[in-house]
Amino acid sequence: MLESPVSLKYITPEEPNGWLSPSASKNTDWSEYYLNLEDPHWGFKSFNDFFTRAIRPEARPIDSRSNSIVHSSDSSPLHFSSEIYGKNPSFNVQPESQFWLKDNEYSVYDMFGAEEREVKDLVDEHFVGGTIYQAILCPWYYHRWHAPVSGTIIKSYRIGGKYFMLNPSCGLGGLHEGIENYVKSLPMLSMVSVRQVIIIRIDDGSGRLVALIEIGMTEVSSCCPTVEEGQYVNKGDQLGYFQYGGSSYALVFDKDLELEFNPNIYIPN
C-alpha cells in the first residue's frame, strides 16, 4: 500500500495534515531535495518514494580530512547526556551482556548475530573492547545511509529479527512516558530488531574496521543495502536506505581506533 499512489493522500502541502505543509516542514529544508513544486505531491509517486527521497549532494558536504569519521545518516545522537538519551558513547563493549536490563549494556555478539565462525572471529579480533555510537532517525529525516569512512566492504549481511520491541524493564506507560521508554529501548533494539550489518576495512593500511549496523524499527521498517561485499566505497558514498518507517543505526569501532567525539552537535527536542 505504501508503494501505491493511494499512499499519497497526506503527501501534500495542505494544512493541517499534509506532510509537506508549513507546520509539518518546520524541521525540513525542502531546498535540499529534488522536487517538482508544480505537482500536487511535489513529484513523489508514493509515501515510500517520499520517505526514501534523494538529497542534493551539496546539501551534505563530506569532511575530507583523512582522520575524520562522518555520520552515516541524518540522525540525533542517542548517547549524549540527558535524562532521555542516557549516557555517552559506550566504550570497551563486551562480547555478551544481559542487554534487556535497565543499564542497556551492548552485547556485540548479539548485535552482529555472530553465529558464523567467520563473523565471530571478526568480532573477537576487532570489536570486543571497541566503541559503539548509536543514533536515531526521526520520520522527517533523510533516510539513506552513507559510508562513514573510505575503505572496502568485507562483510554485508541481513539479520532477521523482531519489530516493535520494547525493553521489558521500561514498560509502556502513557504517551510521553511511552515515547521516552521507546527511546530507552533503542540499545536493546540494536540486538533484536531486523538489521543490516556492513563491515568496512578502513583504507589506511592498518587493517582496522568500522561496522555500520542499520536497525529496522516499528512494524514496517526495512533495510535495503545498495552495495556488495568486495566493493570499495569513498567516505560519503551511499550504502543503502530505510523504507516505510522508524529506524536507528549504530557505528561499532575497532578496539584499536582512538576516537574523539564532537560534542557540538545539535540535538532536536
Summary of predicted features, one role per range:
Residues 1-269:
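Contiguous, well-folded functional domains in the mature portion of proteins
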